[in-house]
C-alpha cells in the first residue's frame, strides 16, 4: 500500500486526518476509483476531471488543478510497484476547525491518494455472470448530489449487503419514477436487437427533462466509444423494468470489473441465462483497451 496525503508520501500508519475534517464530520467529499496496470493508470485524466467538475459544481472547491493532480496520481501508481492496482483518490472539504481558529473564509481541501492491490475476481465471475437484486431505495433526480461520486455510499453499501445476502452480485437502483438508474457501484447496459441501451447519465438529459441521478461513468464512456468502433449503436434513453427483463443481454460497467454480464434479475432469467455474445465481445475489447492504454505510458 502507498499513501499520498496533501502533497506528500507518508507511511500508511502515519497518514492522519483531523477529527474536524469535513469528510469525517459531515461526509463532505468526493472520490474516484481508478484501475492501474504495471504502474500506469487507465483514463486518469478523465477521472480527475470528473472529480474537479463535481467539486466545482457542488461548491466544494474551485481551486483544483487537474494536471498536477493527474501527475500525483501517476506518481502514486508508479511508486506503488503493483502489476494490478486500485488507485483511490479522495477529496474532502478539509479541516473545518480552521474556519473558527484562524478566521479564514476558506480552507484547503484534503486530498488523499492511495494505491492498493486490486481486488481479483475469479474467472467464473465473468464466465457465468451474476444476478442482480432490485433495491428498495430510489435515486432522486432532485438530490443535488445525485450523479456525483460523493463519499456518502452508505445507502449503496447497504443495498450491496442486501444483494449479497440473496447471493446477488449487484443491487439495481431505480429512480423515483421507477425508471432504471444504475447499480450500486456500476452503470447498466441492455442489449436488444444488437443495439446497446443505457439510461441517461447526469448532463445527457433531453432539454426540459428531469435531471438524471446516474453517474457518467468513465468505463461507461469507454464502452460506448468502443461499441461505436465495432459498429454497435448505443441509445441513451429512459428505460423501465420491462425493458430490462425483455433484454437479450444485460451487463454492468465500472473501473474494477470492466464489463460484467448479468444473467438474471432476482428470479427472472435474462436472455439464455448465460453471458451474451455482444457482452463477451465488449469485455474482450475493454481488456485490450486497458492493456493498450496502460502500456503506452
Regions of interest found by a model, annotated:
Residues 179-210:
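Glycine- and Gly-Pro-enriched alpha-helical subdomains that act as flexible
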Residues 1-172, 176-179, 211, 224-297:
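Conserved alpha/beta cores of soluble small-molecule-handling proteins
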Residues 218:
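Active-site microenvironment for binding and transforming phosphate-containing groups
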Amino acid at each position: 500500500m502507498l499513501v499520498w496525503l496533501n502533497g506528500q508520501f507518508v507511511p500508511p500508519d502515519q497518514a492522519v486526518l483531523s477529527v474536524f475534517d469535513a469528510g469525517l464530520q459531515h461526509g463532505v467529499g468526493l472520490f474516484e476509483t481508478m484501475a492501474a496496470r504495471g504502474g500506469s493508470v487507465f483514463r486518469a485524466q478523465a477521472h480527475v476531471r470528473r472529480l474537479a467538475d463535481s467539486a466545482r459544481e457542488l461548491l466544494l472547491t474551485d481551486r483544483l488543478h487537474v494536471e498536477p493532480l493527474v501527475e500525483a496520481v501517476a506518481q502514486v501508481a508508479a511508486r506503488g510497484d503493483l502489476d494490478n492496482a486500485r488507485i483511490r483518490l479522495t477529496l474532502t472539504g478539509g479541516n473545518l476547525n480552521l474556519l473558527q481558529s484562524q478566521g479564514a473564509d476558506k480552507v484547503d481541501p484534503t486530498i488523499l491518494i492511495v494505491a492498493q492491490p486490486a481486488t481479483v475476481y475469479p474467472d467464473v465471475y465473468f464466465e457465468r455472470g451474476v444476478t442482480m437484486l432490485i433495491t428498495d431505495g430510489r435515486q432522486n433526480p432532485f438530490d443535488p448530489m445525485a450523479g456525483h461520486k460523493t463519499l456518502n455510499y452508505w445507502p449503496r453499501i447497504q443495498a450491496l449487503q442486501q444483494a449479497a445476502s440473496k447471493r446477488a452480485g449487484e443491487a439495481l437502483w431505480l429512480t423515483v419514477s421507477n425508471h432504471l438508474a444504475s447499480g450500486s457501484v456500476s452503470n447498466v447496459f441492455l442489449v436488444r436487437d444488437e443495439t446497446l441501451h443505457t439510461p441517461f447519465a447526469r448532463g445527457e438529459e433531453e432539454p426540459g427533462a428531469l435531471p438524471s441521478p446516474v453517474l457518467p461513468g468513465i468505463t461507461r464512456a469507454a464502452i460506448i466509444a468502443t461499441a461505436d468502433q465495432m459498429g454497435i449503436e448505443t441509445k441513451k434513453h429512459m428505460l423501465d423494468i420491462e425493458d430490462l427483463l425483455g433484454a437479450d443481454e444485460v451487463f454492468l460497467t465500472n473501473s474494477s470489473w470492466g464489463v460484467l454480464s448479468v444473467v438474471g434479475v432476482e428470479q427472472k432469467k435474462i436472455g439464455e441465462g448465460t453471458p451474451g455474445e455482444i457482452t463477451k465481445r465488449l469485455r474482450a475489447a475493454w481488456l485490450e483497451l486497458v492493456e493498450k492504454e496502460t502500456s503506452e505510458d
